Amino acid sequence: MVKIGVCGPVGSGKTALIEALTRHMSKDYDMAVITNDIYTKEDAEFMCKNSVMPRERIIGVETGGCPHTAIREDASMNLEAVEEMHGRFPNLELLLIESGGDNLSATFNPELADFTIFVIDVAEGDKIPRKGGPGITRSDLLVINKIDLAPYVGADLKVMERDSKKMRGEKPFIFTNIRAKEGLDDVIAWIKRNALLED
């Protein structure tokens, strides 16, 4: 089972990305999802209503505190959810774990996630990639979402591209508009090539 952590600031499009990935990949792969919210299970409920996956393949973890603690310093609740999900589905191939909304320093405990996708959105401004932080610099894949909003918020995608290359070196990043499925195929191709080790 490959575990992919998806993290990023509130509203960046983490849940939309996971919903789109499950919709496009669950027919070919044995998949499940774990979501994290501080005080609710809202993201899990959204997934249950909007995903093609049955409810038993989605677990919502209510962290009750700082979102990055639940995925990094004390990942015990999430590790228990991973164990529970693996018990339910022993042949699970791909488990997507969504963090609660957090800042640019969010990273996953290596026991919890084999790969990390960090999601930011253009509406936060074109300066976000150059601000760095572990989410930007260390994630396996950086997704820059909501590119359709760039002209409305004064964000320059060329600046974001330049700064992403500078901050990430050889590590990949993908521009997306998840709602319109733009860039989604590139994210799926990255997952298949890097996480699932397909050609």
UniProtKB/Swiss-Prot annotation:
One GO biological process term: urea catabolic process
Q: Which InterPro entries match?
A: CobW/HypB/UreG_nucleotide-bd, P-loop_NTPase, UreG
Could you give a GO molecular-function term held by this entry? identical protein binding
- The residues that cross the membrane are none
Chief localization class?
cytoplasm
Residue positions binding GTP: 8-15
Q: What is the effect of changing residue 14 to A?
A: No urease activity, no effect on hydrogenase activity. Normal amounts of apourease and UreG protein are produced
What's a single GO CC term here?
Answer: cytoplasm
Outcome of gene disruption:
Cells do not express urease.
Pfam families listed in its UniProt record: cobW (PF02492)
Q: Which CDD domains match?
A: UreG (cd05540)
**Key words, A-Z:** Chaperone, Cytoplasm, GTP-binding, Nickel insertion, Nucleotide-binding, Virulence
PANTHER family in UniProt: UREASE ACCESSORY PROTEIN G
What does the function comment of this entry state?
Answer: Facilitates the functional incorporation of the urease nickel metallocenter. This process requires GTP hydrolysis, probably effectuated by UreG.
Q: How does it assemble?
A: Homodimer. UreH, UreF and UreG form a complex that acts as a GTP-hydrolysis-dependent molecular chaperone, activating the urease apoprotein by helping to assemble the nickel containing metallocenter of UreC. The UreE protein probably delivers the nickel.
Task: Describe the family membership recorded for this protein in Swiss-Prot or TrEMBL.
Answer: Belongs to the SIMIBI class G3E GTPase family. UreG subfamily.
Instruction: Tell me what this protein is called.
Output: Urease accessory protein UreG
Q: Organism source for this protein? A: Helicobacter pylori (strain ATCC 700392 / 26695) (Campylobacter pylori)
